[in-house]
Amino acid sequence: MIRISLDLMGGDFGPQVVIPGAAKALDRHPDISFVFYGLKEQCDPFLAKFPKLKEKSVFHDCELAVSMEEKPSQALRRGRYVSTMWRSIEAVKTGDADVAVSAGNTGALMAMAKFCLRTMANIERPAIAAIWPTLKGESIVLDVGATIGADAQQLMDFALMGGAMARALFEIERPTIGLLNVGVEEVKGQEEVKEAGRLLREANIDSLEYSGFVEGNDLGKGTVDVVVTEGFSGNIALKTAEGTAKQIAEYLRAAMSRTLLARIGYLFAKSAFDMLREKLDPSKVNGGVFLGLNGIVIKSHGGANAEGIAAAIEVGYDMAKNGLNQKIENDLKKYHAKRLPPIGPEAA
């Protein structure tokens, strides 16, 4: 049984979307049990519609919910110990849940997760990893917003964590890793990126395969399983991709409704357009994973629909079931053990 703590008040729509999303996830994975954190008066009407979900969950009434507009410092000061967001994270710390999921304020969620769970040994900064649709299937891109201006060692740690996530999510033995850069040549790019490339080449890690630098146009190609970058460029890439997907979808909608002939043509090609629409639907790959913490936290898109919430829950389910944090910890220990100077007789 995988236990998932869920912030029912998170996101733009709160319980009216989060609860149906949880019900969808439960239908697909009957071995999930939920620990809900919400405001009882607002949640009860929606929970009443899903008796099966109610049977597989425990509800905790909380004092307040963190708004989407609150600054991280304000949310931490006001909502620590008493908010739906904090308590859903705390459930992971206390062992009452295997993973926490929230569609709430990203900055507040990261601040609370870092304060409550703390970072793993040998990790200076956490990262947010996004699942990225590609021509070959899916890949992982990190960091997409947690750490602005990462140094070479932090990028190296991101590569280790991203590789562990790829093994947990895609069940591949040795994922390929690429560093996002302005060119594939080794002489190009910022010093931090070039140094991270050197660290990855020399590390000789059994659990991942370093494939060199990749460019922005490689993200959608699926050139590598994991793309590593710092949070500033990663977040811009993520938002650009989301905006481009919406733009293409709008272009198609406008083109298909412009004339009678176009509408007739759409009817004949409906299955192909439906397939394209599904590929462009961000809810299908919803769920950013906070990596580097002593516990698994999943961030759903704030504007996600019920299907998107279900997708985020399923990401958390897969991460917990496949031992994400154990994989990360093992890889970090192996790598950092190699970096330590020998002691005792071996040092002579």
Swiss-Prot record:
Main location, first listed in the record: cytoplasm
First-tier enzyme category under EC: transferase
| Compartments it resides in | Cytoplasm
TM ranges are: none
Q: Name one GO cellular component term.
A: cytoplasm
Classify the source by domain of life.
Bacteria
**Annotated pathway:** Lipid metabolism; phospholipid metabolism
Q: Does the keyword Lipid biosynthesis apply?
A: yes
Q: Name one GO molecular function term.
A: phosphate:acyl-[acyl carrier protein] acyltransferase activity
Enzyme Commission designation: 2.3.1.274
Gene3D superfamilies xrefs: Isopropylmalate Dehydrogenase
Its BP terms in the Gene Ontology are: fatty acid biosynthetic process; phospholipid biosynthetic process
Q: Which UniProt keywords apply?
A: Cytoplasm, Lipid biosynthesis, Lipid metabolism, Phospholipid biosynthesis, Phospholipid metabolism, Transferase
Catalysed reactions, as listed in the record: a fatty acyl-[ACP] + phosphate = an acyl phosphate + holo-[ACP]
- Explain the purpose of this protein: Catalyzes the reversible formation of acyl-phosphate (acyl-PO(4)) from acyl-[acyl-carrier-protein] (acyl-ACP). This enzyme utilizes acyl-ACP as fatty acyl donor, but not acyl-CoA.
Describe, as the record does, how this protein assembles with itself and its partners. Homodimer. Probably interacts with PlsY.
Family to which this protein belongs:
Belongs to the PlsX family.
Name this protein carries in UniProt? Phosphate acyltransferase
Source organism (scientific name) = Rhizobium etli (strain ATCC 51251 / DSM 11541 / JCM 21823 / NBRC 15573 / CFN 42)
* Chain's gene name: plsX
